Design a protein with these regions (language model features):
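Short terminal alpha-helical segments
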Residues: 1-22
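Charged, low-complexity interaction regions
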Residues: 17-27, 43-50, 72-79
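Short, charged, amphipathic alpha-helical segments
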Residues: 25-33, 51, 58
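Active-site-proximal, substrate-binding regions of enzyme catalytic domains
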Residues: 40-47, 52-63, 80-318, 328-359
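Conserved residues at the C-terminal ends of beta-strands
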Residues: 325
Length: 359
């Protein structure tokens, strides 16, 4: 192991122990002084093969110094480490055929949005030449967030499968993407998947914060349900948003009286479907109400996948067809689409697979 490769590992190890309260702040300070003394005393020159490790080591050294000076709180260390690794990943990886973005032409066929499980199945078992041309497949940043999460699990190490995944996604959708827009809610754009992946990785600290908030919610669903005295019968979520308990929870939203007064829910949806705040705040809250009232909730340990499912559901509201390979997400999307009068069709991938492919 090269010298600065070793030092980088030592810093990461001691920071991990500090976060887990296995090392005190005084011991962290002593570690810093010892490393500093060792490097100054050695007068080492950086080996060319060790150059990248040295550059990363410097970033971790600055982080260590900020922690020792108590400028970075213990609970924020993980986000800072991820940010350094993500930045290094983006600097070192030179994607081939990166920018395949082109102008978006007129789309004259139904928009088909798919969750990540469906995408995994398609790229594994269905060659692109077998994909039907009857539908316009559309991806979203949520697909790249899930890909970035896999990259993080591999500690930001690059491998060629990332290239293959991006290439398949771009070709499957012809680079057609749903993107959030403050003025229009969600818009359809043409963009190579490489670009949103870069954005997601470069802003990974925001993803970590979102995951922490999602984990907190899922771990406290039962308490919230008890405190608000929300009770529903049944083992499924079908019709749950029309229950007395749901009405009690929904009554805190400014838009709910308008919803109640509108007999034709489709008209309510048409009025709000282009509102960024309704889509990314209120719709996410409706999703949480469904989860809170669910008598068979998803385990709290699955908070990451749950967060991505919510985001997929939000983007799916803009499609004509939403294909999912997740039974729980299918039930939830079906209930929310029914409740809001969303005209899109929610389908199970197994039933819809013949429609998506050419025999």
């Amino acid at each position: 192991m090269l010298y600065f490769e070793k030092k980088e590992k030592e810093i990461l190890d001691v920071l991990d122990k500090y976060q887990r309260n296995m090392v005190t702040l005084d011991e962290l300070k002593a570690f810093q002084k010892e490393v500093q003394r060792e490097i100054l005393a050695s007068g080492l020159e950086v080996d060319p093969d060790d150059n990248y490790n040295f550059l990363r080591y410097e970033k971790y050294w600055i982080l260590l110094d900020s922690i020792v000076r108590e400028k970075v709180a213990k609970e924020k260390i993980k986000a800072h480490v991820y940010a350094i690794k993500a930045n290094d990943f983006m600097e070192r990886v030179a994607f081939s055929n990166e920018d395949t973005t082109g102008p978006l032409g007129k789309i004259d066929k139904p928009l088909l949005y798919f969750d990540n499980n469906t995408y995994i199945y398609l790229k594994k078992y269905v060659p692109l030449e077998r994909i039907t041309k009857k539908y316009q497949f559309v991806y979203s940043p949520a697909h790249l967030e899930e890909m970035a999460n896999s990259i993080r699990r591999e500690d930001f190490k690059y491998n060629e499968s990332i290239e293959r995944d991006l290439r398949y996604l771009g070709n499957l959708t012809n680079n057609v993407e749903f993107l959030p827009n403050l003025q229009k809610g969600i818009v359809v754009k043409s963009e190579s998947p490489y670009n949103p992946l870069r954005r997601v990785i470069e802003n990974f600290d925001g993803t970590v914060l979102s995951e922490e908030m999602e984990q907190d919610f899922m771990e406290n669903r039962s308490r919230i349900k008890a405190e608000l005295s929300l009770k529903v019968k049944g083992s499924t979520i079908e019709g749950v948003l029309s229950s007395t308990a749901a009405k009690k929870a929904l009554s805190s939203f400014d838009w709910y009286p308008e919803y109640e007064q509108e007999a034709e829910k489709r008209l309510f949806w048409e009025k709000h479907k282009n509102s960024y705040s309704f889509l990314f705040t209120d719709l996410a809250c409706i999703d949480r109400i469904v989860d809170t009232l669910d008598n068979n909730p998803e385990p709290a340990r699955k908070y990451r996948s749950h967060m991505h499912d919510t985001t997929h559901l939000i983007y799916a509201t803009q499609s004509d067809i939403f294909v999912t390979n997740d039974g729980r997400l299918y039930d939830k999307a079906t209930e929310i689409f029914r409740f809001l009068g969303i005209p899109g069709k929610v389908v199970d991938y197994k039933e819809f697979l013949p429609e998506m492919t050419n025999a």
